[in-house]
Design a protein with these regions (language model features):
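N-terminal glycine-/serine-/threonine-rich phosphate-binding loop
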Residues: 1-82
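Conserved phosphate- and dinucleotide-binding cores of soluble alpha/beta proteins
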Residues: 2-6, 58-60, 64-216
Length: 216
């Protein structure tokens, strides 16, 4: 019988390793999700002089409760590092993000930082990206957008932090670059949850009792 994977412990290991990458004086992007929630306590314990931007109200509230300063993104000219989780991390460096419905903000932050670090448990590491792929959609003309997209399922979830409708593409992924381009061309799609390897600096994978570091 295979050994039971302690997902909680793996998330915590990856999160603690990422917290150690943050240094005094840095500007830091904080992602959204269960693994990022485990990043905040060890980051707060270090009592660093940092300035942070959060990708969701949930992360902002949790960070402020722990004494981590959070500012509006537009006050920061650049980000030294951003740390976020992922729903899937493929061997070729593609990510799927957006299980928490904040992938539009997460992608903006990932593109604006000099170092985007992804933290996951071993169950999120996959050979190839597969559905579902999260989508944020404009509420206006939603039915027309859904018809154009085809294989999409609306999610029973709260709107995105910016009021978008959250859905999932559930069709064949195939080449993620081709799918990303096709989804982006559909009017009404605010953003999709496919993150290309060019955005990713490194991935920290909690695996058993260790952290595996993958450079993309």
């Amino acid at each position: 019988m295979p050994a039971r994977v302690d997902t909680e412990a793996e998330k915590r290991l990856a999160a603690e390793a990422a917290a150690r990458l943050v240094e005094d004086g840095m500007t830091v992007g904080l992602g959204t999700g269960s693994t990022v929630a485990r990043l905040l306590p060890p980051l707060a314990e270090r009592e660093l002089e940092i300035r942070c931007v959060a990708t969701s109200p949930r992360t902002e509230s949790a960070a402020l409760d722990l004494g981590i300063p959070v500012e509006p993104f537009d006050r920061l000219e650049r980000l030294d590092i951003a740390i976020d989780g992922a729903d899937q991390v493929a061997l070729d460096g593609w990510l799927v993000k957006g299980g928490g419905g904040a992938h539009t903000r997460e992608k903006i932050v990932a593109a604006a930082t000099g170092r985007f670090v992804v933290i996951v448990d071993s169950g999120k590491a996959v050979e190839r990206i597969a559905a579902p792929v999260p989508l944020e959609l404009q509420p206006f003309g939603l039915r027309a957008t859904l018809r154009e997209l085809g294989d999409v399922r609306l999610r029973d979830a709260a709107p995105s932090p910016d009021g978008g409708v959250i859905a999932d593409y559930v069709g064949e992924v195939g080449d993620p670059m081709e799918l990303a381009a096709r989804l982006a061309l559909v009017p009404g799609v605010v953003e999709h949850g496919l993150f290309p390897p060019v955005l990713v600096s490194e991935v920290l994978v909690g695996r058993g009792n260790e952290v595996e570091r993958l450079e993309i």
